[in-house]
Curated annotation (Swiss-Prot):
Belongs to the peptidase M16 family. UQCRC2/QCR2 subfamily. Residues 1-14 form a transit peptide. This is Cytochrome b-c1 complex subunit 2, mitochondrial. The keyword Acetylation applies. Component of the ubiquinol-cytochrome c oxidoreductase, a multisubunit transmembrane complex that is part of the mitochondrial electron transport chain which drives oxidative phosphorylation. One of its GO terms (biological process) is mitochondrial electron transport, ubiquinol to cytochrome c. It comes from Homo sapiens (Human). The keyword Mitochondrion applies. GO terms for molecular function: metal ion binding; metalloendopeptidase activity. It is linked to Mitochondrial complex III deficiency, nuclear type 5: A disorder of the mitochondrial respiratory chain resulting in a highly variable phenotype depending on which tissues are affected. Clinical features include mitochondrial encephalopathy, psychomotor retardation, ataxia, severe failure to thrive, liver dysfunction, renal tubulopathy, muscle weakness and exercise intolerance.
Length: 453
């Protein structure tokens, strides 16, 4: 496969085969080409391949893997955080310098992101250079070496990465919220615990990759590439680890509370209960409920005064605040509730007023106008998100890992429209009656404990 000189091959990667050129379909001459339909293939080993030839000047390929932090255990916490930083380390087929310089030379980009469920390795570049980036993507995900000295050099970056992320109090509160809500799996942090920084070893990285980066846990998604060629690459180079890998533990919701007292004048608080599994009809009801209550301002720098939560809290305090509904769905659980930011002295009034507003809906006080407006906001938000190629790639990859298929936007909109008022009221009732979890940070002298709510 071509490198900087356009004359290299995959001979160093796996010496048995030479990778085909990953070229996009040539655009027809004359009239502007029309994007093709999304093509989906599931190989016998469980690997899912999907592609959309949209004739964009930029090609994007993502390898999505069921290997998020939920698959760690108490002995290897922080492994996925370090994995996110190792994409430029030496592999069996390319040195660290070769990867970095090769991507840089063509103006490409290799990024690694992770959620509690999945990891995603994504490359993007001009469509004529996609074969170069594909080689590096395959090297990084299938043939890492994790040399001890290179891994050791990355350890301080864990601390910096975490410190930068935690400059936003919301990041820390959401991390604490999951730790309070679950006993295992989804309780695992996205960022390496402080006591593990400097202790994550190359052996732990190898073990995690060997047992979770298997074909049946992967989905290869491409935009602006040919499906037959992408399928050929997957069959040749992503078929080296069969089986399902290590199965992860089912998330066990318990309910709990984590309070972090500090000197901040603003109190950040998240107050939730267990909701619904991603992709279920009940999860759709919680999504509509989120937009009934208020999921954030729809006018840039707007005051969000049309939000039901905002209106309720505004009657309880004259001090500045922010409030929105919180909603997170996973493959075997979910969290729904309220996120508030307030002055320390008003924290109790803000949280209680927001909670009482959800109780009002649980009692059946819900108009058809509010429901239709919420559905419109939810549908518009979804459609606008998948207009972005980055978000579309992520959406297809996530669906491929969960269901092995793709649900088109038209079907998603139909499911949103099918949510009845009674479904939304039942979702509110489930939150009100459910075992609560809470995380808060700031000057918490006026912040109620979870059992006081």
């Amino acid at each position: 496969m071509k490198l900087l000189t356009r004359a290299g091959s995959f001979s160093r990667f796996y010496s048995l085969k030479v990778a085909p050129k990953v070229k996009a379909t040539a655009a027809p001459a004359g009239a502007p080409p029309q994007p093709q339909d999304l093509e989906f293939t599931k190989l016998p080993n469980g690997l899912v391949i999907a592609s959309l030839e949209n004739y964009s000047p930029v090609s994007r390929i993502g390898l999505f893997i069921k290997a998020g932090s939920r698959y760690e255990d108490f002995s290897n916490l922080g492994t996925t955080h370090l994995l996110r930083l190792t994409s430029s380390l030496t592999t069996k087929g390319a040195s660290s310098f070769k990867i970095t310089r090769g991507i840089e030379a063509v103006g490409g980009k290799l990024s690694v992101t992770a959620t509690r469920e999945n990891m995603a390795y994504t490359v993007e570049c001009l469509r004529g250079d996609v074969d170069i980036l594909m080689e590096f993507l395959l090297n990084v995900t299938t043939a890492p070496e994790f040399r001890r000295w290179e891994v050791a050099d990355l350890q301080p970056q864990l601390k910096i990465d975490k410190a930068v992320a935690f400059q936003n109090p919301q990041t820390h509160v959401i991390e604490n919220l999951h730790a309070a809500a679950y006993r295992n799996a989804l309780a695992n942090p996205l960022y390496c615990p402080d006591y593990r920084i400097g202790k994550v070893t190359s052996e732990e990285l190898h073990y995690f990759v060997q047992n979770h980066f298997t074909s049946a846990r992967m989905a290869l998604i491409g935009l602006g590439v040919s499906h037959p060629v992408l399928k050929q690459v997957a069959e040749q180079f992503l078929n080296m680890r069969g089986g399902l890998g290590l199965s992860g533990a089912k998330a066990n919701y318990r309910g709990g509370e984590i309070r972090e007292q500090n000197g901040d004048s603003l109190v950040h608080a998240a107050f939730v209960a267990e909701s619904a599994v991603a992709g279920s009809a009940e999860a759709n009801a919680f999504s509509v409920l989120q937009h009934v209550l208020g999921a954030g301002p729809h006018v840039k720098r707007g005051s969000n005064t049309t939000s039901h939560l905002h209106q309720a809290v505004a009657k309880a305090t004259q001090q500045p605040f922010d409030v929105s509904a919180f909603n997170a769905s996973y493959s075997d659980s979910g969290l729904f509730g309220i996120y508030t930011i307030s002055q320390a002295t008003a924290a109790g009034d803000v949280i209680k007023a927001a909670y009482n507003q959800v109780k009002t809906i649980a009692q059946g006080n819900l108009s058809n106008t509010d429901v239709q407006a919420a559905k419109n906001k939810l549908k518009a938000g979804y459609l606008m998100s998948v207009e972005s190629s980055e978000c579309f790639l992520e959406e297809v990859g996530s669906q491929a890992l969960v269901a092995g298929s793709y649900m088109p936007p038209s079907t998603v909109l139909q499911q949103i429209d099918s949510v009845a008022n009674a479904d939304i009221i039942n979702a509110a009732k489930k939150f009100v009656s459910g075992q609560k979890s809470m995380a808060a940070s700031g000057n918490l002298g006026h912040t109620p404990f979870v059992d006081e709510l």
